[in-house]
Amino acid sequence: MTDVRFRIIGTGAYVPERIVSNDEVGAPAGVDDDWITRKTGIRQRRWAADDQATSDLATAAGRAALKAAGITPEQLTVIAVATSTPDRPQPPTAAYVQHHLGATGTAAFDVNAVCSGTVFALSSVAGTLVYRGGYALVIGADLYSRILNPADRKTVVLFGDGAGAMVLGPTSTGTGPIVRRVALHTFGGLTDLIRVPAGGSRQPLDTDGLDAGLQYFAMDGREVRRFVTEHLPQLIKGFLHEAGVDAADISHFVPHQANGVMLDEVFGELHLPRATMHRTVETYGNTGAASIPITMDAAVRAGSFRPGELVLLAGFGGGMAASFALIEW
């Protein structure tokens, strides 16, 4: 757990134009709108156009966040892109984003902590801000529609594409929400619960792998749900205890938008009596690392956060991993 202490001075988001209904995504998987809604709470999602890549989504969200922050790309010190669906295995997607934004001279790197990635990226830029100053652009962006098996009802109904972004600056930059504390956790013994089996150095993707569908995202949904419902509430309670914050002090809860039904279960176990849980899963689905910053940006634009309120971000996903951030608005 780390005290980080910098401000969020702007947020932004981007989702593709194409709306994909439950009936459209469910038909090849043999399920209908009613089944998907009951199991996930998701009613629709957005999928990228054929000519869009993850960096395109990330760039659009980054531009929106920079505009909200009132700074130019040239003022950035570092860009961190959290993604598990990069444009290519190499180079980093963040390099494309840097170029598209015109952020010449800015350091740029990727973070792959799957759906926990944005808070991991947020923590990763803290050192750069301390030692070099300036501003950081943190983006969560994923394009899962390209790695889904259309016949796998356990996964294809869950995911949408999108990107969300935050501009961070030192606490000396006037007023605005302060990131007070972050915590990162990884449970490497559970790596097989969420995976894309082939395409890396352990198992290069060949014709046999393609025939077997090993290029697709795969998940042990039952065990993932067990991990989340059993571990996440306790990890969050420990995080708040170490931060010296009572559960009743939390005004807003912004979790990773994995599955609407599962979010209700987790929120019920947390016992945050005054907190509002913010959601976008019904309209955007699970957007991977993008889900927290997309949901946070929606709340910012709705005027949901008030000065002095505490906001809790909670990421969880492949690794297995979990990540938390405490923000004082």
From Swiss-Prot:
Protein name: Acetoacetyl CoA synthase NphT7
Protein source organism: Streptomyces sp. (strain CL190)
Reaction equation(s) it catalyzes: malonyl-CoA + acetyl-CoA + H(+) = acetoacetyl-CoA + CO2 + CoA
Subunit structure: Homodimer.
InterPro entries registered for this protein in UniProt: ACP_syn_III_C (IPR013747), ACP_syn_III_N (IPR013751), Thiolase-like (IPR016039)
Similarity comment: Belongs to the thiolase-like superfamily. FabH family.
GO BP, sorted A to Z: fatty acid biosynthetic process; isopentenyl diphosphate biosynthetic process, mevalonate pathway; secondary metabolite biosynthetic process
Gene: nphT7
EC number: 2.3.1.194
A single MF term (Gene Ontology): acyltransferase activity, transferring groups other than amino-acyl groups
Role description: Catalyzes the condensation of acetyl-CoA and malonyl-CoA to form acetoacetyl-CoA and CoA. Does not accept malonyl-[acyl-carrier-protein] as a substrate. Can also convert malonyl-CoA into acetyl-CoA via decarboxylation of malonyl-CoA.
A Pfam family assignment: ACP_syn_III_C
Phenotypic consequence of H256A: 40-fold decrease in activity
GO cellular component, one term: cytoplasm
